[in-house]
């Protein structure tokens, strides 16, 4: 079975300066080491080494100081074997880093039975990336979310006063309501109109914030 050191050596040998530059421009801080592997390459390693069956190694990767190794661990870890204490520990570790890591952590939490407890807590956080994770989790659970309408109203009323990445995730929540909740489709369109254009600092990139109304309508047209 492959070890942490062997994985670290393999990833380092695959270092990609161009991707490193892209990831730094997207917000990966200098405080984290970075080899610049693409997500597809990480997933190939997971399949080859059957890392999803090695929970302990995945945890070890997550608790490293290398963004590639951390994300590899987040992709491989068993959500139901992770403790609530570990989740909060990782939240603290990642909340002032960059969105790739918090996106990965939110994806783990979304697969757990207690996901909505974290979402409810995290949207009240003072940390932008933590709050953003809360809204991401709510979006993942949109079809099993009795409070969806109340959250949509909150997004409508407060999005523009929220911090950077939180605005992005709240905009995503409005879009999710508009696409997947027939009973909230019109209210989501109304919310998007009320909110107006959403500005988010996405780093030195050409990435743009999705326009909620056009995104909803295009997605609905594809479905229908």
Swiss-Prot record:
Q: Which domain of life is it from?
A: Bacteria
Could you tell me which Pfam families the record lists for this protein?
A: DNA_alkylation
> Which InterPro entries does the UniProt record give?
ARM-type_fold, DNA_alkylation
Q: Which residues form a coiled coil?
A: none
Task: Supply the name of the protein.
Answer: Uncharacterized protein Lin0241
- Native organism is Listeria innocua serovar 6a (strain ATCC BAA-680 / CLIP 11262)
């Amino acid at each position: 079975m492959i070890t942490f050191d062997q994985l670290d050596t393999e990833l380092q040998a695959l270092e990609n300066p161009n991707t490193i530059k892209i990831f730094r421009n997207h917000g990966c801080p200098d405080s984290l080491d970075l080899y610049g592997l693409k997500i597809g390459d990480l997933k190939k390693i997971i399949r080859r080494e059957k890392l999803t069956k090695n929970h302990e190694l995945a945890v070890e990767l997550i608790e490293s100081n290398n963004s590639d190794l951390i994300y590899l661990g987040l992709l491989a870890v068993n959500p139901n074997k992770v403790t609530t204490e570990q989740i909060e520990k990782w939240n603290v570790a990642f909340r002032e880093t960059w969105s790739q890591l918090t996106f990965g952590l939110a994806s783990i939490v979304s697969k757990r039975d207690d996901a909505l407890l974290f979402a409810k807590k995290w949207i009240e956080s003072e940390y932008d990336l933590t709050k953003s994770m809360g809204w991401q989790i709510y979006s993942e659970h949109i079809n099993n979310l009795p409070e969806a309408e109340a959250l949509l109203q909150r997004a409508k009323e407060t999005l523009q006063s929220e911090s950077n990445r939180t605005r992005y995730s709240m905009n995503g929540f409005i879009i999710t309501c508009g696409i997947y909740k027939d009973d909230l489709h019109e209210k989501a369109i109304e919310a998007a109109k009320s909110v107006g254009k959403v500005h988010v600092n996405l780093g030195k990139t050409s990435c743009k914030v999705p326009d909620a109304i056009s995104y909803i309508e295009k997605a609905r047209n594809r479905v229908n």
